[in-house]
């Protein structure tokens, strides 16, 4: 069995797949699976050879014995079926359906929301300061799945209302996690079993913490305990290796949420 992963260290969607690989007993890059680091700063995800594998022009892209799988959540579910033990989804059909509903929510809400402060804090000022409107538009036109996102952001980055809305969506996510832990008996989101849901939620929460927005969940005790338990797992340490966070990857450009609040008032 040959597993290859085309990924980026600090990409939240790449991190979801690395967490799943680690939980399936394949934690080591370059040993348990073949690593292909995609440099998003050089737009390697838009090179013809990459687009042949993944026409969406995003990371990650997964290969299993030469067969290509794209989209991080689809890759996670593929790994669950290809490597059934340890199980990361409930066996009960109703519980499994509820787990998939969670995966849909996590894809549509926090995974999307976290991009707003990520670009406000780092990517927009790092990539587009000094660029002309034409250069910015040309860049957006190259991105199959992100063009509308860039058009909404504009060259100046996101404003106060956008960041507050994104933080509100992360807060909603944290409240739902906290309630699910209470309803299901914990310690994990669906109860006693650590699942793909816990893995899928982890990168968005880690990104928010890295940017200094962890005050969002400080009053949610079950959520705080869950987060501490997540960070104690070996899979977390294997996934968030040095350089896997924005603050480590781009220290000269990175701004914490607090710095932005002081500079901009939000």
Residue ranges of model-derived segments:
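GST-like domain detector, emphasizing the conserved glutathione-binding G-site
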Residues: 1-144, 183, 257-258, 264-266
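Short, hydrophobic secondary-structure boundary micro-motifs
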Residues: 86-91, 113-114, 189-191, 217, ...
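Long, positively charged, glycine-interspersed low-complexity recognition regions
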Residues: 218-266
């Amino acid at each position: 069995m040959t597993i290859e992963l085309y990924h980026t260290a600090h990409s939240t969607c790449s991190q979801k797949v690395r967490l799943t690989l680690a939980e399936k007993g394949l934690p080591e890059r370059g040993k348990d699976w073949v690593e292909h680091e995609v440099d998003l700063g050089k737009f390697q995800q838009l090179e013809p050879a990459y687009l042949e594998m993944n026409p969406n022009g995003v990371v990650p892209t997964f290969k299993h014995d030469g067969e290509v799988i794209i989209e991080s959540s689809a890759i996670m579910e593929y790994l669950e079926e290809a490597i059934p033990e340890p199980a990361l989804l409930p066996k009960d059909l109703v519980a499994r359906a509820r787990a998939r509903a969670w995966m849909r929510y996590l894809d549509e809400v926090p995974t999307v929301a976290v991009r707003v402060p990520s670009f406000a804090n780092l990517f927009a000022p790092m990539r587009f300061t000094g660029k002309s409107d034409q250069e910015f538009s040309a860049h957006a036109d190259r991105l199959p799945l992100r063009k509308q996102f860039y058009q909404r952001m504009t060259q100046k980055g996101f404003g106060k209302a956008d960041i507050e809305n994104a933080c509100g969506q992360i807060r909603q996510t944290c409240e739902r996690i906290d309630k699910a832990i209470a309803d299901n008996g914990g310690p994990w989101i669906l109860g006693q079993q650590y699942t793909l849901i816990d893995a899928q939620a982890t990168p968005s929460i880690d990104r928010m913490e890295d940017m200094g927005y962890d005050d969002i969940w400080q009053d949610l005790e079950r959520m705080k305990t869950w987060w501490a338990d997540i960070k104690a797992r070996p899979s977390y340490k294997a996934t968030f290796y040095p350089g896997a966070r924005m603050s480590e990857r781009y220290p000269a450009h990175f701004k914490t949420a607090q710095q932005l609040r002081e500079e901009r008032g939000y």
